[in-house]
Amino acid sequence: MNKKRRRSNPLLIILLAGAIIFLVYFNVMVVPGMNPPFVPTPTETRDPVSFEIEAQNLATEGKFIAAIEAYKQAINANPKKIDNYLNIARIQIYSGDYAQAQVSAENAVLLKNDNAEAYALLGWAKGMQQMYLEGEKDAKTAISLNPNSALAHAVYAYILALRVEAGMNELNTMDLAIEESRTALALDANLLEARWARGYVLEITSNYADAVEQYEIAVQLNSNIAQLHLALGRNYMALGQNDEAIFEFTKAYSLNPTDPMPNYFI
């Protein structure tokens, strides 16, 4: 006796075929684009140059704190680029953070120990922290590396003037400060630091009107540095131009509210 043949179920066949097609599609098209479980989704890496551009723009706008943070990100993204250390050190000096400026400049020296700008900024940062002899040594090193560096001569002049004001000068310290400030200007009359140093040398020699002229040019080159406005205000006050002095002291305070000196003069 023959067994009755079992009839196929068309619906079951259709469902099985659909399941097979779905599995094939899932493995070929979907799985390759999925991340494994518990693995974070990769994020797009930002171009290190974009941090530098952002920092430069912020610095130009006078937003020094934000610019410093952007330069820190640029350094993290590209720790071997010396320009970022030099730029952040300069802005840290502008904003009065001399200790951190020293660290940044020291890192620049570690990266390239024959860079005149790195030594000049290091000397400036030290000088502003009353480490006059150490700062002077770094400034001299900068000049020996690049005798045509206006920045190096300006920093050297400024530190010598600081020594005179602090009563730590020798017989020829003032004469040397005057000479170095003139050399810096002769090398680059458009360098802010050259005008700043020349103004300071003139100030401590009581040439207040000439100092005002130099500080005013420096402010035109960068109007966002509190110390420049403070210096300009001091010299206006010495000339008896009290309204102008108060304006500059107020501007200095608005740029750096943590500095008590503007309020002291006001």
Task: List the predicted regions and their residue ranges.
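Long, contiguous interaction/recruitment modules in multidomain scaffold/adaptor proteins
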Residues: 1-47, 132-133, 137-147, 151-161, ...
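Short coil loop/turn residues that delineate tetratricopeptide repeat
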Residues: 46-47, 80, 114, 131, ...
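Alpha-helical segment of the N-proximal tetratricopeptide repeat
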Residues: 46-83, 87-97, 128, 162-166, ...
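Helix-start (N-cap) detector for alpha-helical repeat units in TPR-like alpha-solenoids
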Residues: 48-49, 82-83, 116-120, 150-154, ...
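Structural signature of tandem alpha-helical TPR/SEL1-like repeats
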Residues: 62-69, 95-107, 129-141, 164-183, ...
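Canonical tetratricopeptide repeat
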Residues: 87, 121, 155, 197, ...
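Alpha-helical adaptor scaffolds
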Residues: 90, 158, 200, 234-238
